[in-house]
Each structure stands twice: as C-alpha cells, then as structure tokens.
Amino acid sequence: ALETSNGIHFVAIGGDEHGNIHGNFGWVTIEGEAVDITYVADE
C-alpha cells in the first residue's frame, strides 16, 4: 500500500488462483470529491 501526502492512495493485492492481481487507487479532486478505482489485472 502507498499513500502520498496529497491524498493519492494505491493498493495492490496478490494474485488469485488464476494469477489475476486485484487492487484499487484513488484521490480527492480539487472540488473535494473522492475518486476510487477498483481493478482486476488479468490476461
């Protein structure tokens, strides 16, 4: 996990039985709105 002083965060979680990597990242916009992205990295 990584979080910067300006509110950007990133988390990657190890692979599942198919080798897929799960994770999420996000930030807060200038307007104060939280943006969160969740992903699965696969082939």
From Swiss-Prot:
Keywords associated with the record: Cuticle
Any one GO molecular-function label of the UniProt entry: structural constituent of cuticle
InterPro entries linked to this entry: Insect_cuticle
Domain named Chitin-binding type R&R: residues: 1-43
Protein role: Component of the cuticle of the larva of flesh fly.
Protein name: Larval cuticle protein SC1
Taxonomic placement: Eukaryota, Metazoa, Ecdysozoa, Arthropoda, Hexapoda
